[in-house]
């Protein structure tokens, strides 16, 4: 992407608007939203990166390891489950988000928070396609995180193997 500076600049602006640390949605939750969206899209590269970023920013390692079981894990609140459900549905092709899901979102999240949640899902729609199409090799830290926390649940680096 560095070959297209305007593209990089636009992406950085979009990323910083979504990943603001002082947003209304917990930064760690946004990373887990991006993670389950990436899993739905099948992008092992982004799954490893979002798990590593979540770990790096202080998300409990047990929660990262349990994220694929968020619907039943006691580590997740109902509000988090509702947001993660929308992430799975919103990342599906075709999109599977429903009016009922958004009604549930509104029970726990205000409009600004919902925009942050959907922004994270949409941003990773782009990043999943970019990284899965170009198939970059995984860097050491995300690869190690993937192997430690995600591989026990079936994750592999796939075409992103170093």
For every predicted segment, state its role:
Residues 1-162:
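Hydrophobic alpha-helical segments
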